[in-house]
A protein has these predicted regions:
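Bacterial Sec-dependent N-terminal signal peptides
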Residues: 1-22
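C-terminal, surface-exposed recognition/capping segments
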Residues: 149-268
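Second-shell loop/turn segments in exported
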Residues: 97-104, 119-120, 214-215
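Conserved hydrophobic ligand-interaction patch in extracellular adhesion modules
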Residues: 110-172, 228
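Residues that flank catalytic or metal-binding motifs in active/ligand-binding sites
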Residues: 84-86, 120, 222-224
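N-terminal module-boundary/linker segments of secreted carbohydrate-active enzymes
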Residues: 21-68, 213, 243, 250-268
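Soluble non-cytosolic domains of exported or imported proteins
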Residues: 44-48, 66, 81, 103-111, ...
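Conserved oxyanion/phosphate-binding beta-strand-loop segments in alpha/beta enzyme cores
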Residues: 61-91
Length: 268
């Protein structure tokens, strides 16, 4: 009997460690839809759009499917050749506003993204993590670049609709649709007023956007997306905060492939 109880307890722990939800306020039934967000925000300046989005998202106005995080597995070898296995949880899609029936992806500045991440016990991914998320994705779409009015609210919504036309209601971890706003040592070392972007992988697995810190931190365009990562990393089934992982000279390689992995969050 004791063995049965122990087995059941072990399975419950394993099941809990393999699933995660972000805790978000319950969405108000009267909250605006994704379409309505873009109609209201069409004339906004970037900081007005940012503030509007943050207010809606922190109030719980996100599609419920976005709360169910997906595990991404990674591993490295230590100096002795021993495998170190880890996994972490990410949102299945990019930060969005609305209901499951009418929602839309919302490009945001890193300051707004960080505010949302902090509120939901999350952080933004690194370049390596974006690569690993792409490899793990079950829905991989071909990038669709747009060239006119790249930073306009209208173009942001048009791009969302194009992606939805490609997706064709397929569900699961999606990638290949956006450049990620990422954490990078290049920001802390060289360009504190900049943002780092990376990704938008093509079907061959190569990113359109190499790691880039040329944009000022308030620049937001249609191609940017915000992927949230739950801040607890499970290393050999031990729960460790992502900052402690990035500070560890060995474990940081699980999450980061840069020489300096000392940029943990964007100030706001």
């Amino acid at each position: 009997m004791n063995k049965i109880v122990f087995f059941f307890f072990t399975m419950v722990l394993f099941s809990c460690s393999q699933s995660k939800k972000i805790v978000v306020p319950q969405r108000n039934k009267a909250a605006i839809s994704g379409t309505e967000f873009y109609k209201k925000a069409v004339a906004f300046h970037w900081h007005e759009r940012d503030s509007f989005a943050v207010k809606e998202i922190l109030a719980g106005n996100i599609p419920s499917f976005l709360k169910n995080l997906v595990a991404v597995h990674t591993s490295i070898k230590d100096s002795s050749g021993k495998n170190i296995n880890a996994f972490y949880f990410v949102t299945p899609d990019y930060v969005s506003i609305g209901s499951n029936e009418d929602w839309a992806r919302i490009p945001l500045s890193p300051m707004a993204a960080q505010q949302i991440a902090d509120s939901f016990h999350c952080f933004l991914p690194t370049r390596k993590m974006v690569d690993d998320i792409y490899k793990a994705a079950t829905v991989k779409l071909e990038p669709v670049p747009m060239y006119a009015f790249r930073d306009s609210t209208i173009t942001m919504y048009q791009h969302h609709l194009i992606i939805e036309g490609q997706r064709k209601l397929r569900r699961g971890l999606i990638a290949g649709i956006k450049k990620d706003v990422v954490l990078s040592g290049k920001v802390s070392a060289d360009k504190p007023d900049r943002e780092a972007i990376y990704g938008w992988h093509k079907p061959d697995g190569k990113p359109i956007q190499p790691l880039y810190t040329g944009h000022i931190n308030w620049w937001v365009d249609y191609s940017h997306g915000i992927r949230l990562v739950y801040r607890t990393i499970y290393v050999s089934n031990k729960a460790i905060d992502y900052i402690d992982v990035l500070k560890d000279p060995v474990l940081k390689k699980l999450l980061c492939d840069e020489e300096d992995c000392d940029f943990f969050r964007y100030p706001y």
